[in-house]
Amino acid sequence: MSAKDAGVQLELDGRPLPRGPRVYLRRPLLRDRTEFLARNAASRRLFRGLAPPLTDPRVFTAYVRRVHKGLTVGLLVCRVEDEAIVGCANLSQIVRGPFQSAYMGYQVFEPFANQRYMSEALPLVLKVVFRILALHRVEANIQPGNLPSIALVKRAGFRLEGYSPRYLKIGGRWRDHERWAMTAEMYRDVSRSR
């Protein structure tokens, strides 16, 4: 990896992206396409009914371009030991001004599910939200049957704010979602208690 690539990948707004003992965050590059698409394709069963897997090279290219234009914050979750892409997180619809908020989505790929990689990665993503981007609020919308994801945000300190019937169309069906959120004040309280 060139020094230029390393800087683009491991920084956001000129600040280093956070690392944990087992995972670190980095921004995607076009050269990640083969691994990223293969991980998505291998995760079809895991994602069934939750999100369509991203397997189209053109869609991945457009995603990376949006990330590098600053239209969305895309983060790959990579394993420290071998740099494998184990998952990803995205911050979208970032609104500044008096709202200072974003929506967050995330996923872990097969065969890395149920190994607590996202339990380590989510607090790193929250550091990006509240320390690097200096947002006041982040929201995650989760289908009620996605118990592992609900457990993940609960452990991270999110609170349930509401229920949105027929919120998002996935797999040709409108799906209900629970609205989970965290504010900067909640993040400070959670960070102090750990």
Annotate each language-model stretch with its function.
Residues 1-35, 39-44, 74, 78-194:
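Acyl-donor (CoA/ACP) binding surface of acyl/acetyltransferases
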Residues 45-64:
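Conserved GNAT-fold acetyl-CoA-binding loop/helix
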Residues 55-58, 68, 107-108:
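Juxtamembrane/interface motifs at transmembrane-helix termini
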Residues 63-66, 128:
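A generic secondary-structure signal
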Residues 65-76:
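A short helix-loop-beta-strand connector motif used in the catalytic cores of GNAT acetyltransferases and
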